[in-house]
């Protein structure tokens, strides 16, 4: 899952990039507002983290221009903490507003909340013959209905929505169970095994791949 970070403070940019990368996200980071707007319009990002005070073009201008073309979720970062500034940010199209200084754990929680909310709006997912509906929690593959538990559904959605990415066990444990990963715990591996029994085993082409020492990945196949 790809996130765009537009932040001109080098130290903030580096530690946010490192933290989000360790959490399993792919990060593009730029420090100039014009470069940020160019990337935001050119590429399809799952989320944009946007500083307000930027060289080249400020965050307000970026938001206004972006909202004429896209509805990508945006979290604003700024040292400006007045009520008027927060209202302006939200009225300009920001989905959330985080005042500096902030803890990375809070930023990560807000990132995950925005991504969950955005996924909820996109209620269906279709890939490689797999069809999922997040409203009815129905799943089918090649028009064959599959019954999953709620956690299995969430796990499959996480993998399929990030097809082609390697998702570490730590990220899966945090996203699905809200727990810190313990190397002595096989919760994730057991859940993947049960999911494969329903989604992969009855079919000749396998969708869930193990990337040894790294995690799991959803393999898109041509239909």
UniProtKB/Swiss-Prot annotation:
This is Transcriptional regulatory protein HprR. Phosphorylated by HprS. Residues 122-220 bind DNA. HprSR and CusSR form a unique regulation system, where both two-component systems recognize and regulate the same set of genes, but under different environmental conditions. HprSR plays a role in H(2)O(2) response regulation, while CusSR plays a role in Cu(2+) response regulation. Under low protein concentrations, the two regulators recognize and transcribe both hiuH and cusC promoters, albeit at different efficiency, apparently in a collaborative fashion. The modification 4-aspartylphosphate is found at residue 51. It comes from the Bacteria. Member of a two-component regulatory system HprR/HprS involved in response to hydrogen peroxide. Regulates the expression of at least 5 operons, cyoABCDE, hprRS, hiuH, cusRS and cusCFBA. Bifunctional regulator that acts as an activator and a repressor. Disulfide bonds: none annotated. GO terms for cellular component: cytosol; protein-DNA complex. The gene is hprR. One of its GO terms (biological process) is positive regulation of DNA-templated transcription.
């Amino acid at each position: 899952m790809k996130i765009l970070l537009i932040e001109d403070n080098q130290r903030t940019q580096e530690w946010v990039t490192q933290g989000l990368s360790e959490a399993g996200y792919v990060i593009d980071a730029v420090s100039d507002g014009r470069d940020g707007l160019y990337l935001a319009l050119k590429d399809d990002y799952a989320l944009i983290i946007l500083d307000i005070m930027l060289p080249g073009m400020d965050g307000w201008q970026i938001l206004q221009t972006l909202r004429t073309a896209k509805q990508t979720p945006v979290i604003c970062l700024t040292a400006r903490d007045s009520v008027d500034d927060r209202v302006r940010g939200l009225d300009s199209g920001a989905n959330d507003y985080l005042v500096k200084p902030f803890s990375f754990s809070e930023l990560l929680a807000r990132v995950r909340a925005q991504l969950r909310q955005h996924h909820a709006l996109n209620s269906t997912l279709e890939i490689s013959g797999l069809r999922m509906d997040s409203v009815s929690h129905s799943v089918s593959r090649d028009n064959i209905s599959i019954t999953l538990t709620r956690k299995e559904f969430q796990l499959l959605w996480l993998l399929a929505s990030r097809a082609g990415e390697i998702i570490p066990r730590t990220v899966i444990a945090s996203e699905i169970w809200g727990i810190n990963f313990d190397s002595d715990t096989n919760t994730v591996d057991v859940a993947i095994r049960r999911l494969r029994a329903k989604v992969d085993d009855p079919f000749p082409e396998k969708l869930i791949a193990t990337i040894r020492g790294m995690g799991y990945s959803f393999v898109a196949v041509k239909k």
